[in-house]
Amino acid sequence: MNNSYSAKLTPLANSLRKKMTKEERHLWYDCLKLLPVTVHRQKVIAPYVVDFYVASCKLVIELDGSQHYERKHSEEDAKRDAYLKKQGCEVLRYSNADVNLRYRQVCEDIYNHIQKSDSP
């Protein structure tokens, strides 16, 4: 990891942890913290800060608000996802609406991806 990026992004990550959205809090406290693996919130994977990261299986979990559906943001997300995949990460993206309306399915999907990565 590039230390200059990390030094700049760490304060941002700390701030984002304190200002989680309602959907991030719900997913974190009611699902991700209960998983049998360590999940990091607002993890620096330079040059980005990802919403959630499971290091044991290199799984990135991103929650997208409505701004992510604007062309500029969707292009940035595609570039970000490509970079993370080059680093060997799998990226799961869910909308805030997914968390609000399909919460159980989102949690099951995340759990299944973790289980799949633990399988030989």
What function would you assign to each model-found segment?
Residues M1-P120:
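Nucleic-acid endo/exonuclease domains
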